Amino acid sequence: MVLTKRIIPCLDLKDGRVVKGTHFVGLRDAGDPVELAQRYNEQGADEVVFLDITATREDRGTIIDVVQRAADQLFLPLTVGGGIRTIEDMKQILRAGADKVSINSSAVADPNLISQGAERFGTQCIVVAVDVRRNYETAPGKTPITLADGQECWYEVVTHGGSRGTGLDAVAWATEAEERGAGEILLTSMEADGTKEGFDIPITRAVSETVGIPVVASGGVGTLDHFYDGFTEGKADACLAASVFHYGEFTVRQVKEYLAGRGIPVRL
């Protein structure tokens, strides 16, 4: 059986509202995540990611409320990330109706969180988000990756929104995450993110070819071709995008029809 490739819109939330403006015609409230997610649901999205980027962690109630409302109204898988630091945080988000939780900096700080979460809730619930940046300084034990221009680098895992290097090799960290029980890797290249010049293919392919769990490519989509490249050259199992969907440049359905026309198996 051929597994279909997934298209996943991502919504960044701050204080329960969508940030990164939206230009959807006919939305009463472009800042309401549930209304926006419902629109993507109607367009045939395979799942939706809510990323809580609220700086303060005192009030988890807001995101819990959003997740509950979304889970009540949507019939598609929902992944929630941002500020999930403990098993208790995971439990609250999953109990509110999320299908998966995405952990990032907290997993780097304490890799046991991956195994504990997988043990408690099942590997299918645990997404490890890996943010990476190119590092051109040669270092022993790092996975060398050749770029399109012939330069060689390794990819370093970064945390705290890309501001903090960890010294961890991205391919090695993705492998460890899988071994510890992650069910999926959400891979974002800091170089590509926001550029609209396409996914960072070299690292996407390197991770996809190394791990046995699904890899979601994220960061850099600007054209329909970029989705195609993510699946074919990047070997990704899913492609995630934000602004191209929020600004109405394409609908999820347009992306899927384009991909189907080029022989990529998608759920239409």
Swiss-Prot record:
One of its GO terms (molecular function) is lyase activity. The keyword Transmembrane helix does not apply. The active site is at D12, D131. Its main location: cytoplasm. One of its GO terms (cellular component) is cytoplasm. It catalyses: 5-[(5-phospho-1-deoxy-D-ribulos-1-ylimino)methylamino]-1-(5-phospho-beta-D-ribosyl)imidazole-4-carboxamide + L-glutamine = D-erythro-1-(imidazol-4-yl)glycerol 3-phosphate + 5-amino-1-(5-phospho-beta-D-ribosyl)imidazole-4-carboxamide + L-glutamate + H(+). Pathway: Amino-acid biosynthesis; L-histidine biosynthesis; L-histidine from 5-phospho-alpha-D-ribose 1-diphosphate: step 5/9. This is Imidazole glycerol phosphate synthase subunit HisF. It comes from Methanoculleus marisnigri (strain ATCC 35101 / DSM 1498 / JR1). The lineage of its organism: Archaea, Methanobacteriati, Methanobacteriota, Stenosarchaea group, Methanomicrobia. The gene is hisF.
